[in-house]
């Protein structure tokens, strides 16, 4: 009986500990739910803090009448619209809603609140400085092909700060009626973090990494690309016949048939393991932003499914931000870090609010493999399929 009581007490303690852990690390997600009645209540009593870019350009602020206002430039408002969000919380992943824990003063200490009450001062939320650059975001928006949908992510690979995260189409947060009337266009969705797409040839980075990690004697690798590779009842095709080429040549030419053949040597277990080490099938719980989970099929794939997955097709899905993280990992010598969107949080009194520490970087591939991939990716841009981007 005493043993049973002890076990029940221990289980109860574990539940309480997990609850406290969840509130501390993920409480911001609960606060950020646009249906949380505490948000609307808090807005009635708290002056919402200011959002700025990394250089201090004001992106959103609260005026003297308590109304949420946005940057005076329509071009700027649209360039950062999905990152900043809107006053009504229609873009629930935007900073105005997702970081309500700071902007609406949920993180204010009891002493700060008592000081406001004692002086009769209306409580003011924290100011949040984001890592993005308004100028860079606006430049990307101006260069983006008109009428096209897509996303662009720019990361500082050393710090994993998000310097720009632009999604098309866009909306103006000062005219939400128009945005909601055209909601089917998808402007309220941040395609960089919420859009799940077949990564295509960018996934060849993962396949190449898996091959370099697991297959021997790749220095002598040669494959004769005839323009198609029969596998099962299907053929993986290429735009042209590349002829006999090394692995480096195949990567530079983005040769589908070579990577389809590599997949058969790797098998679904080895390729799937590398994909998962690089974040596929992971439940992303980042501190600064919501990112939808990428997926790679890990069940017993058929030969043709495996071949298509090796070139980023089939059932492989990823967000643009995740693929940018993978590229950043290569530049960072094989270590993947959590993306950062918050640069600083400042209290109403001018002090720095303590932020949750970001998860430490984890090694996903060896440094030697990362260095080799970096060289190969540079070659792609200098003389391969990426040359037009140079």
Regions found by a protein language model. Give the residues of each.
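Periplasmic/cell-envelope proteins involved in peptidoglycan metabolism and beta-lactam response
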Residues: 1-180, 187, 196, 221, ...
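Beta-lactam-recognizing serine transpeptidase/beta-lactamase-like catalytic domain environment
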Residues: 55, 115-116, 158-201, 206-390
């Amino acid at each position: 009986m005493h043993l049973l009581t002890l076990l029940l007490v221990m289980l109860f303690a574990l539940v309480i500990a997990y609850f406290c852990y969840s509130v501390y690390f993920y409480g911001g997600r609960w606060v950020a739910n646009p249906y949380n009645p505490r948000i609307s209540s808090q807005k009635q009593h708290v002056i919402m803090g200011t959002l700025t870019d990394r250089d201090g350009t004001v992106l959103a602020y609260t005026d003297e009448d308590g109304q949420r206002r946005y940057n005076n430039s329509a071009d700027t408002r649209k360039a950062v619209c999905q990152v900043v969000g809107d006053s009504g919380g229609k873009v629930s992943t935007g900073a105005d809603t997702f970081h309500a824990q700071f902007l609406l003063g949920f993180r204010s200490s009891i002493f700060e609140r008592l000081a406001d009450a004692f002086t009769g001062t209306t409580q003011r939320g924290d100011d949040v400085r984001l890592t993005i650059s308004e100028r860079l975001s606006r430049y990307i928006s101006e260069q983006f092909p008109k009428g096209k949908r897509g996303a662009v992510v720019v990361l500082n690979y050393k710090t994993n700060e998000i310097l720009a995260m632009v999604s098309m189409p866009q909306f103006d947060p000062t005219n939400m009626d128009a945005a909601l009337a055209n909601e089917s266009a998808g402007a309220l969705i941040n395609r960089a973090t919420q859009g799940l797409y077949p990564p295509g040839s960018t996934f060849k980075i993962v396949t190449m990494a898996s091959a370099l990690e697991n297959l021997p004697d790749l220095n002598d690798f040669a494959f004769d690309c005839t323009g198609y590779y029969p596998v099962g009842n299907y053929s993986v095709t290429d735009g042209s016949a590349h002829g006999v080429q090394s692995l480096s040549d195949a990567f530079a030419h983005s040769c589908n048939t070579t990577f389809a053949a590599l997949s058969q040597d790797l098998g679904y277990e080895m390729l799937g393991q590398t994909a998962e080490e690089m974040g596929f099938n992971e439940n992303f719980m980042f501190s600064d932003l919501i990112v939808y989970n990428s997926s790679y099929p890990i069940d017993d794939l058929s030969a043709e499914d495996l071949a298509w997955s090796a070139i980023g097709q089939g059932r492989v899905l990823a967000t643009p931000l995740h693929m940018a993280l993978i590229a950043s990992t290569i530049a960072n010598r094989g270590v993947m870090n959590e993306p950062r969107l918050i640069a600083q949080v400042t209290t109403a009194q001018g002090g720095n609010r303590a932020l949750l520490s970001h998860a430490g970087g984890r090694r996903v591939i060896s440094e030697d493999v990362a260095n080799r991939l970096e060289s190969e990716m540079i070659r792609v841009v200098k003389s391969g399929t990426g040359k037009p981007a140079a």
